[in-house]
Amino acid sequence: MTGNMHYTFPMLTNQAPFDDVNVRKALKYGLNRQEMVDKILQGHGMVGNDHPIGPANQYLATDIPQIEFDADKAKFHMKAAGLTELNVDLSASDAAFNGAVDASQLYQASAKNAGININVVQEPADGYWSNVWLKKGWCACYWSGRATEDWMFSTAYESGVPWNDTHWDNARFQELLLTARAELDSNKRRAQYAEMQMLLSQEGGTIIPMFANTVDAASTKLAHGPDIGNIWQMDSSRLTERWWFA
């Protein structure tokens, strides 16, 4: 089943050219997401839409328009940014996630059809999280996801937090983060989280091409209840509580 683990390509939005929202949008439209799910995850996952809220979250917004590969839209946004072509480095290592280098090369191939030239820089696995993530302008990354929307947003998207790996700072998003956290009406909170997901999808600095399935194997000697959690691996990390020897 598909959980909240997702693979990402965060851009530092306080650095050129990623500080231009049109450059970010061009890169969003330059990616064939389904191809990445098919070839990197072998079909064991689902396409992402550039926000981190997954199918195991309560307030996943399912009505946000899906971003798909569109060379014309990518070129439109490059032109809006004053560019006829775009040349960018993408740092990657399989330390980021299994298949990250291959995923980056797939991205490179699809983006080329939109006039975007991605130079894939294969970084050493040793020291990747110290020397590349949060340091290089654009890189490969992954997140295991979080059990609640507020937890996910507060960890990686709140302004000023250490793990905001895009340095994206949107005033409306930050306002909604605080109001949704305090909102007791579930319908109002759902609407607030939906707007936050839309803002990230359309303007944010993270490309999120795919969410991964949780694939577990178990002996027939083990038994479990009717449902299996998909927030994290191993029955949402509660295998020792909810499984038993048959």
Predicted regions and their residues:
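Periplasmic binding protein-like
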Residues: 90, 103, 108-160, 192-193
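Solvent-exposed, polar/charged alpha-helical surfaces in well-ordered, non-transmembrane soluble domains
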Residues: 9, 16, 21, 25, ...
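Structural recognition of the beta-strand scaffold that forms the well-ordered cores
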Residues: 1, 7-10, 29-30, 37-38, ...
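Bilobed periplasmic-binding protein-like "clamshell/Venus-flytrap" ligand-binding domains
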Residues: 38, 81-98, 139-144, 184-220
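Structural transition elements
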Residues: 47-80, 96-102
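Short, solvent-exposed loop/beta-turn-alpha elements that line the ligand-binding surface or hinge
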Residues: 1, 10-20, 54-73, 130-135, ...
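Loop/turn elements at helix/coil->beta-strand transitions in domains of secreted/extracellular proteins
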Residues: 20-24, 32-36, 83-89, 114-117, ...
